[in-house]
Amino acid sequence: MEWSLPVDLQEEILSRVPAKSLARWKSTPKQWKGPISIEFLHLLRSTLKFPLLNLHLKSKSIYVTSFTAMVFCYAPPSTKDSRFGIHVQGKPSGLNLDTGTVSPTFRLSNKVVVCCKWRSDSINTIYFVGENKHVQVDQRRGDLTLGQSCSFLMNYVPSFVQIQQGTLLAPRT
């Protein structure tokens, strides 16, 4: 799709369109549709009603205390004096013995699902599903154990957002 509008106007338009609708556009750029074709997402696709969108982290830590977002839709950044966002906190609720992953589940009032997939190449991906009832995090058993709490601070959850920079803490022991 070729845009002839200013970037700020493009972002404003896209921020008003639901993520579900954007993912269905045939003219959606490949960079937005790419995450849907990842093998991990194919496994989840049959059980989820909404398209998966992604955020990338470059650390194996489960703790994300704050981050700066690079956005495809408008997302106001936080400042030292003001944090605009959602704080999500919880404890792991189950252990998948087949894959060796701990899957903590969080409840969110704004109904957004986040799935963190920690891959062997040390690039961590948080998948935003959108308009659902919980946040699910998959983490390697060695890095997080049952009973430990996890915490996320999300500045904003626009239709499409990618983490550019983050403050990450090691899991508590």
Swiss-Prot record:
Q: Which residues are in the F-box domain?
A: 1-46
Query: Which SUPFAM superfamilies does the record associate with it?
Result: F-box domain (SSF81383)
Q: Which InterPro entries does its entry note? A: F-box-like_dom_sf
Instruction: Provide the protein name.
Output: Probable F-box protein At1g27490
Please name the source species: Arabidopsis thaliana
